[in-house]
Each structure stands twice: as structure tokens, then as C-alpha cells.
From Swiss-Prot:
Function: The preferred substrates are 1-hydroxy-neurosporene, 1-hydroxy-lycopene and 1,1-dihydroxyneurosporene, however the 3,4-didehydrolycopene derivatives such as 1,1-dihydroxy-3,4-didehydrolycopene, 1-methoxy-1-hydroxy-3,4-didehydrolycopene and 1-hydroxy-3,4-didehydrolycopene are also efficiently converted. 1-HO-carotene derivatives can be also used.
Catalytic activity reported: rhodopin + A = (3E)-3,4-didehydrorhodopin + AH2
Keyword tags: Carotenoid biosynthesis, Chlorophyll biosynthesis, Oxidoreductase, Photosynthesis
Name of protein: Hydroxyneurosporene desaturase
Name of the coding gene: crtD
Family of the protein in this entry: Belongs to the carotenoid/retinoid oxidoreductase family.
GO biological process, one term: photosynthesis
EC number: 1.3.99.27
């Protein structure tokens, strides 16, 4: 490896999955990498909280797109199997509706899902489901390269990369339509429309404003959903351990107060205690709005555009639970639907209030496809979508208690009873998320994916400030653990490409007889 690569210093700010990925891959390429995070442990949103003596995963709960992690570990000279224990789930999710029997399971086996839908909604809906899955597969196959793997896709580059067949597949789903309208063409049963419309919330969006292309989430789940031994926080710990083994210097419990800028480029960071760490490049794994609002200093404001509050994605009320349950056969992922799905998103995005008929998602963290085999307390994450207004109001008990009681009532009407007490659960509100992740209002998915052009409006890994690179769920390709990991990979690849380009150009200059500065003190293009 050339000397400039061995001596190039990088500071990664934020140890979410994107920052961990960038740090790991850059260190694996031989760069001098320091990773800082204000939290005492790695993971960002993939954190754990102690509830009545047990650690409960408090953030993302779904492990999909395993190929993303396989490729990242391979690039670092390791395998996922060496660091994580994964169990494929046969049941992707169990769905229930207020006052409605039976329940509906979706399976990793598409034929089993079709059979279940046939029993639930009739044979014609089962055939429509298979057609829906075929279209989702085609859409995913066409968009994976031009969009997910691309550093900065534009409408023009997408059109060119898709080619005639890809464009035809895209036009068949009605790309200018919203997800709900598209689903109404696929399914007649409103409960199936409601079930698959929930895919919009994976990006923090409303099905009535999200683009129809989000139907590709169906294919992501069909490609596999895994349970991680130790929970999703174990993924962060595995990344951190491998990064340290590859030479990354981790500084947990050290918040970044300012990104240092000199001569128009990022040159390091100042920690909350006043310590300065100089660097040739900085990777910022945090919400881009923190930069735009000047929370990392005034000079980095210009690095990216601000996200207006109206463009924020969903936040949530989450209850972290360690309690006994009864009456409902929970699996790993469970969804309890209320009636009038449209009102949930009208309440959140238009009325800016907690939903009066909110869907409740429950991750039963001690279960896979089967029960836990005892009446011992089990760890749950219960989630209801909420407006990202955590910087505008406190979300105190006068607002959250009625939502909590409505959510418990919905689960009871679907058959689930939880031993609920102040000791067995902890509530996290949008205001809490805002304090954990400043400048977001508590939004958990970056900008909302609303409108067919929204995917092109996300910041890319290359910021407007030379030497500063961006990674995370608010950055392309978007939210979710695998996509955020992909953004970290794209940031690392972009930084390396700039560094390689600069090294080559300097070698050309030197060969021409002109002097040049060391790559450790100069900038990258």
C-alpha cells in the first residue's frame, strides 16, 4: 500500500451502524482511523436499555439484506458467522386486527404465505399476492444497482442505468403513484392493503404520500429475515470489536462538540472536553440537520442543506418491556392493526398529534417462530408511530397516557395481555429521541420518503465541505440498518476514491518535476 494511504488520518463521528461500517472499512484499507461517540457503547439507535434487570433492544429490531453485512465483513477479512449467531425466521411477521379472526402470518416461503392469504382472503387474493411479489422482485432487481449501490443517483443516471427493461418494469407499477393507490390495484381486501401499506413506515413515511416503489420492501423480506442472538445491539458490538481488531481507535463516551474547519476543509474534531483530534478527513455519522443547524460549529453548516420540520419522517412512542404475557401466540415480529388506517397518518402528519387509532408493533425479543416455553417475563419493544415534534413539545403524560391505554386496549382486543406496571416498562417519546439524536425532532428515519422524487433529495456521502463525508439513515440510500450500513460503505468508498485520485494526480505532478505537499497535510479533491 502506498505511503499516503497508511498515513491518512480519519475521524469518524458517531458509532451507529453507518459510522462503524465506515471506520471498519477504512481501517481495513490501512488508514489511521479514530471513532468517537458520546454514548458509552456502540450502536447509535441500536442501543439497549435495562428494564427490571434485563437488557432490552431499544432501536431497530429487524435484520434483513444479509448480503450487505456479508460483503462488509468480507472486505475486512472476516465473515459474519465468526462474529454473529443468526437464525433465519420462518415466520416473517404475525398480523392481527381488532375484533377480527383469524390472524395472518407471512412466511419466508412465498407459497406458504400465498396459502395463508388464500385462507384469510380467498384464492383470488392469493394469486394477486403472487403477482405482487413478482412485480416487487422485478422492481428490486432493477433498482438495486442503479439506486441502492450508487453513491449519488440522479433521475438522469437512473434512467440511463435502468435501460428499456428496467424503465418498463418501473412504469408498470406507476412510479408517480403513491403506495396506497398502487396496493389498491393489487389487492381487493382492505386488510391486505393495510398490511402491505405498512412498508411505507419502514422509511418513516405515510402510505398515502410514499412512492409506489416502496413495494420492493416485500422482496427484501422474502430474501430473508434473521433473529440475532443477543439482539440487534450485538450487531453493533460485533462491528466495533472487528473495527478495533483492524486498528480503529474507539473513543466511546467522548462526544464531538465541533468539526474543525481550516482553509475551507474539515481538518478534525474538538471533543466535549476540549481535546482536539486532527485529521485529513472526517466522516459524520449523524443526522444531517445537526450540521445544517450549526450544532457542530458554524463553518460545517454549509456542508449540507437543512431538512425542514415538515419533511421529517415518523418518530415513535416506544415502550421497552420486561413482563409476562398471555393470550396471544407471539412470534418475533407482531403487528396489531386498528381500523381506519388513513386516520393514523392524518393524525401524525397533518394534525401533528399522537394517533387515535394507531398500529402497534411488538418485537418479542426472546422468541423466534415458537413460544418461549415458560411463563417467565419476556423482553418486548412495543411501538406506535408518532409525529417528530420532540423539539417543539414535551410529550408529557397528559398526551402519552391516553395513547398508552388505547394501545394496550387494542392488543387486548387482539388477544394479547401484558403484565403492565411502572416496574416492567420504560417509555421513550419523540422528545427523548430528540435529546438522544439532536436536530431531528425525534424523527427516526431522516427525511420522510414522500413523493416520487424524494429519494433523490437525500444528501449523498460527499458533502459540500471538502474533507467531510456523510453517512447514516438521513443520507442516501436511506433508513434501516442495512441501508445505513450501505451508506457507511459508500462514504468509505467515496473517501478512498478521492484519496486515490489525489494520490495519482500528485504522482503525475511529481513526475513532471514540480514540488507537492504530503498527502497527510493536503486536501482531497
Amino acid at each position: 500500500m502506498a505511503e499516503p494511504l497508511r498515513t491518512h488520518r480519519v475521524v469518524v463521528v458517531g458509532a451507529g451502524i453507518a459510522g462503524l461500517t465506515s471506520a471498519l472499512l477504512l481501517a481495513a484499507r490501512g488508514l489511521d482511523v479514530t471513532l468517537v461517540d458520546k454514548a458509552a457503547t456502540p450502536g447509535g439507535k441500536m442501543r439497549q436499555v435495562m428494564v427490571d434487570g434485563a437488557p432490552v433492544d431499544a432501536g431497530p429490531t429487524v435484520f434483513t439484506m444479509r448480503w450487505v453485512f456479508d460483503q462488509i465483513f468480507a472486505a475486512a477479512g472476516a465473515t459474519v458467522e465468526e462474529h454473529l449467531k443468526l437464525q433465519p425466521l420462518g415466520v416473517l411477521a404475525r398480523h392481527a386486527w381488532r375484533g377480527h379472526e383469524p390472524r395472518l402470518d407471512l412466511f419466508a416461503d412465498i407459497r406458504r404465505s400465498a396459502e395463508a392469504i388464500g385462507e384469510f382472503s380467498g384464492p383470488q387474493e392469493a394469486q394477486r399476492f403472487l403477482g405482487f411479489c413478482r412485480q416487487a422482485r422485478q422492481l428490486y432487481d432493477h433498482l438495486e444497482g442503479p439506486y441502492i449501490r450508487s453513491e449519488r443517483p440522479t433521475l438522469g443516471s437512473m434512467v440511463g442505468d435502468l435501460g428499456p427493461r428496467g424503465l418498463m418494469a418501473l412504469m408498470q407499477i406507476g412510479p408517480f403513484s403513491n403506495l396506497w393507490r398502487s396496493l389498491s390495484r393489487h389487492f381487493r381486501d382492505p386488510k391486505l392493503q393495510q398490511l402491505f401499506a405498512r412498508y411505507a413506515t419502514y422509511c418513516g413515511a405515510s402510505p398515502w404520500m410514499a412512492p409506489a416503489t416502496l413495494m420492493l420492501v416485500a422482496q427484501v423480506e422474502l430474501d430473508g429475515v434473521w433473529a440475532v442472538e443477543g439482539g440487534m445491539h450485538a450487531v453493533a458490538k460485533a462491528f466495533s470489536a472487528l473495527a478495533e481488531a483492524r486498528g480503529v481507535k474507539t473513543r466511546y463516551g467522548c462526544g464531538c462538540e465541533q468539526i474543525l474547519v481550516r482553509d475551507g476543509r474539515a481538518v478534525g474534531v474538538r471533543l466535549a472536553g476540549g481535546e482536539e483530534i486532527t485529521a485529513d478527513s472526517v466522516v459524520f455519522n449523524g443526522d444531517v440537520n445537526a450540521l445544517a443547524q450549526g450544532l457542530l460549529g458554524d463553518p460545517p453548516r454549509r456542508a449540507t442543506a437543512a431538512v425542514a420540520p415538515a419533511r421529517r419522517s415518523l418518530s415513535a412512542l416506544t415502550w421497552l418491556v420486561n413482563a409476562r404475557t398471555s393470550g396471544f401466540p407471539l412470534v418475533r415480529h407482531n403487528v396489531f392493526f386498528d381500523e381506519d388506517y388513513a386516520s393514523e397518518f392524518d393524525d401524525i402528519f397533518r394534525q401533528r398529534q399522537l394517533p387515535r387509532r394507531g398500529t402497534v408493533y411488538v418485537c418479542a425479543q426472546d422468541r423466534t417462530d415458537e413460544g418461549i416455553g415458560s411463563d417467565a417475563p419476556e423482553r418486548l419493544l412495543c411501538l406506535v408511530n408518532a409525529p417528530a415534534d420532540g423539539d417543539r413539545r414535551p410529550f408529557d403524560h397528559s398526551e402519552t397516557d391516553p395513547c398508552e391505554q388505547r394501545s394496550l386496549a387494542l392488543m387486548r382486543e387482539c388477544g394479547l395481555t401484558i403484565d403492565w406496571s411502572p416496574q416492567t416498562h420504560r417509555l421513550v417519546t419523540p422528545a427523548n429521541f430528540e435529546r438522544l439524536f439532536p436536530a431531528t425532532g425525534g424523527a427516526l428515519y431522516g427525511p420522510a420518503t414522500h413523493g416520487w422524487m424524494s429519494s433523490f433529495h437525500r444528501a449523498s456521502s460527499t458533502s459540500r465541505l471538502p474533507g467531510l463525508y456523510l453517512a447514516g439513515g438521513s443520507v442516501h440510500p436511506g433508513p434501516g440498518v442495512p441501508m445505513a450500513a450501505m451508506s457507511g460503505r459508500l462514504a468509505a468508498e467515496t473517501l478512498m476514491a478521492h484519496l486515490d485520485s489525489t494520490s495519482r494526480s500528485r504522482r503525475v505532478v511529481i513526475s513532471g518535476g514540480m514540488s507537492t505537499r504530503s498527502a497527510t497535510t493536503g486536501g482531497m479533491a
